Amino acid sequence: MRVTLSTLDTCESSFTPLVVIELAQDVKDETKEWLKNRIIAKKKDGGAQLLFRPLLNKYEKETLENQNLYLVGASNVRLLLGAEAVGLVKECTDAAMRAFTYGTRHNFKGFHDNNNDFLTMAECQFIIKHELENLRARDEKMIPGYPQAKLYPGKSLMRRLLTSGIVTQVFPLHDTEALKKLEDTWYTRFALKYQPIDSIRSYFGETIALYFGFLEYFTFALIPMAIIGLPYYLFVWEDYDKYVIFASFNLIWSTVILEVWKRGCANMTYRWGTLVMKRQFEEPRPGFHGVLGINSVTGREEPLYSSYKRQLRIYLVSLPFVCLCLYFSLYVMMIYFDMEDWALSLHEDSGSEWTSLLLYVPSIVYAVVIEIMNRLYRYAAEFLTSWENHRLESAYQNHLVLKVLVFNFLNCFASLFYIAFVLKDMKLLRQSLATLLITSQILNQVVESLLPYWLQRKYCARVKRKVQALKSEVDTTLYEQVLLEKEMGTYLGTFDDYLELFLQFGYVSLFSCVYPLAAAFAVLNNFTEVNSDALKMCRVFKRPFAEPSASIGVWQLAFETMSVISVVTNCALIGMSPQVNAVFPESKTDLVLIVVAVEHALLALKFILAFAIPDKPRHIQQKLARLEFESLEALKQQQMKLVAENLKEEYQEDGKEAT
């Protein structure tokens, strides 16, 4: 019997809840009933054909506090059909990666009719999210019970419910048993070991697994730099000419690790299926607004906004504001140097041990101020980028990343460039770099993980006491879990995590010939970062929906750009050293020309290495080429079959006319 969506039952009273929908407390009953009917309705009737029930039944509502929470799930067959709809790629029995189809399900590795583990829980939740987001308005002109909440044909109902405040949040539930197993193999025992990246991917999805994979790879890639930099730091502190070898190694290292990462990333994402997964058509982001019109691509009615108006907002408002923030950052930097001069003069006047400690205070204060400014600017950048009214989420993210990277780069490194190339004080440069690096690492650990974890523990204790005080006769395990998770913070993505690594990469690579110990501090920080980030994902934030990814995206370009800038800075610093200057006592022009020539040679070597190392391993390239060939052959056969059917129909019609 061929299974189709129209034959599936959506009235199961008991099912495994995967996703929670929270409604506002004052939502009207007719709205709840309408939403329920749309979620459980069959696909042919415009529904999502999912399983849906309130968290509390009538009896439990009398005993427990009603929270307007609803559980969403799906039958195994419905999830498999959904996997085909979203284009999930799975491994076949012949070891090839192909898009999953329900009709050919037995050709896929690990599939059995009675096996519910073929799809990971992250994939199941991603499918449900996709189905909820693809619930479209049909004939309704408004949300029942809310005449002010207008609906337009073809637009996403869930996004409209969220923007109108009827639905307050939609989030996936944790699987407590699977989470406990993951924690045991991931971070509960502090040890120098590889992370369970495949298990992280199965639980949290590809985007988060790629971040932890990159964090692990970057940490181990830093170890050679740390080992080589340690003796340089201990034995040749002032001999800058001897740092030429170390700086040259650093420049080659930064290129090789980024190219090798691309190959490793291709291996991982091919194994996960996201490298060959077809990109879904991108819908307008929830915050996008404009005059109602017809989309020329989809033919659907949706808000339209002139790109000319958007460009005006960017160049007349956003750009001047960013420049103003950059100016303010430079102004704060000059105040920091005034504080340095004050501390130095105080120490020279007294010469005591206490005033020698005071020399580090301006750098520590400045590092804290930098972190505060970075976070305040982030909020301003998000507001401005949202106000620019970008239609697509990808465009929004690209503009946000550009704003944040430019400001963070200047805010974190401007003082170091000023010390290096204006003041030319290498001792102060070492001191400032070390202070900024270590202080920022400590602050990030406390603010991002430890403080939120402590606050979450306090809230968990309050909820548990509240539930235990009810002394209800019903099982409150699921109720307590949902209540705890709904109040957890929302994980906003890997943006801040990659940004932290990007800045760390800058501290390590930009001034490596002055402070070789930076790599060692980065390694120590990253070993604790793995555990604190894992704790953050498992215990501090709500479980995020899985997002398929084939790479680390724009961050690859950001790291490569930083490595190019590091070539210029290290060559300039070596050229400024007294030992190198002594070789050219008469003509500084010759020195400048040689430094520029060496810098160009290193950049040329860098780009040659990047070109010589393929982004994808040979065997992956062959498999991708084979998949493309099979796809073209299948399309060709489908067209030939269609032509044959048309010819057959024409032949039959001609035969009828002849008789």
From Swiss-Prot:
Q: Name one GO molecular function term.
A: calcium-activated cation channel activity
- Where would you say this protein principally sits, based on its record? membrane
Name which cysteines form disulfide bonds: none
List the Cytoplasmic topological domains. 1-207, 262-316, 374-400, 522-553, 612-659
- Does this UniProt record's set of keywords contain Transit peptide? no
**Where, in residue ranges, is this chain on the Extracellular side?**
229-240, 338-352, 422-500, 575-590
- List where in the cell it is found: Cell membrane
Offer one Pfam family short name for this entry. Answer: Anoctamin
Source domain of life = Eukaryota
Residue intervals passing through the bilayer: 208-228, 241-261, 317-337, 353-373, 401-421, 501-521, 554-574, 591-611
Q: Which GO terms describe its cellular component?
A: cilium; intracellular membrane-bounded organelle; plasma membrane
Q: In which tissues is it expressed?
A: Predominant expression seen in epithelial tissues.
Q: Does the keyword Transmembrane helix apply?
A: yes
Protein family according to the UniProt entry:
Belongs to the anoctamin family.
Q: Name the job this protein performs.
A: Does not exhibit calcium-activated chloride channel (CaCC) activity. Can inhibit the activity of ANO1.
Fill in the misc note.
The term 'anoctamin' was coined because these channels are anion selective and have eight (OCT) transmembrane segments. There is some dissatisfaction in the field with the Ano nomenclature because it is not certain that all the members of this family are anion channels or have the 8-transmembrane topology.
Which PANTHER family does the UniProt record give?
ANOCTAMIN, ANOCTAMIN-10
- What is the name of this protein? Anoctamin-10
Task: State the species of origin.
Answer: Mus musculus (Mouse)
